[in-house]
């Protein structure tokens, strides 16, 4: 994995061991642990919400037997785990002392690596198809779809990105009404998307506000303090959204499997 190789390079250059910290709603934690288990000079701590990831994902994180891996189940939601991780990263002296580094989308290297997936898919299309392609992306933390949007900012012509959410639809509500508002996390059949604070939206906001970091901080602080923020005339070219309920998810899985013989991951 790219991050593993980058960490090895960093350790060889600095001579300092790394403490890798991440929060996961299911997918990232298992992938990070798989890539870093048994690595010399690296200790991995992954926080995840107790009882809110799938049994398979939890086993993938907790049954490795690796001495450098510490999966930590916390009470609460993914948003609580993510907030804890961000608080630790904001302590600069602690971060330097333990060689703290991130493994989920807090780390921009993860986002940049994901943008390559979109380029690979785009290159496999014919010239006529490329300019009319819309990527539909299951979205919770807004990392993967933001990676695709970044690629379009680099000059690759992509028609659009459709943000697909489950019933935890903070992003769908944002794109439709301009209101970014907190709500309770509702457990769903798509637990990796059971998120109400989409951390990578802050990165999109940086572009929307023309790189005005002071204004970005004001908006995000207001959102976190008040639980909501209303944007006037909110629109980002190329983005659309939709959400589905727990009733619709199995219906769609069954329909796709019946018509195409493909079993969709919820």
Enumerate the language-model features and the residues they cover.
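PLP-dependent amino-acid enzyme catalytic core
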Residues: 1-266
